[in-house]
Amino acid sequence: MESNAHIVEYWKTQPEVLEACLKNSLPLTENFVKLYQEVRPTHLYLVGSGTSLNAEETAVSFMKEMLDIDVISMPSSYVHDIRGDRPMFVFLSQGGSSTNTLKAMEETAAYPFITVTGEETCEIASRSSCHMVIGCGEEPVGPKTVGYTASV
């Protein structure tokens, strides 16, 4: 288990990670914007587990307001009730290897989707033709705090 001092030092990196995300928001979101414009979804589904799901829940209201469409967050272990003529999925996994998220990707493969992870090279990115990196890098501690900040 990590020492508390190590975790606290890691948590202190959040402001610089957030600042980098904001500075690089255009290149970081380019693939999402491109897919969104191609699909013009009627519903946007944010799918993840754990900290990723918590970050998605936080982002739902903002995304609804900005995109003016239905935005639904759901756990990757229970993808259900897909609605709309043109649904689109966002699969978020800071660590990039969530088995539930990989399973959800397989179950919804008929729909357009983008994967979002903390690093470019990971299992989830390798199974996606449209990928976005959130810029938090690898999380060396259990709680995905920096990943949460970058995801939101």
Question: Where do the model's predicted regions map?
Answer:
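Cofactor-/ligand-binding subdomain signature composed of acidic, glycine-rich
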Residues: 1-34, 38-39, 113, 150
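Glycine-rich phosphate-binding loops that contact phosphosugars or nucleotide phosphates
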Residues: 37-152
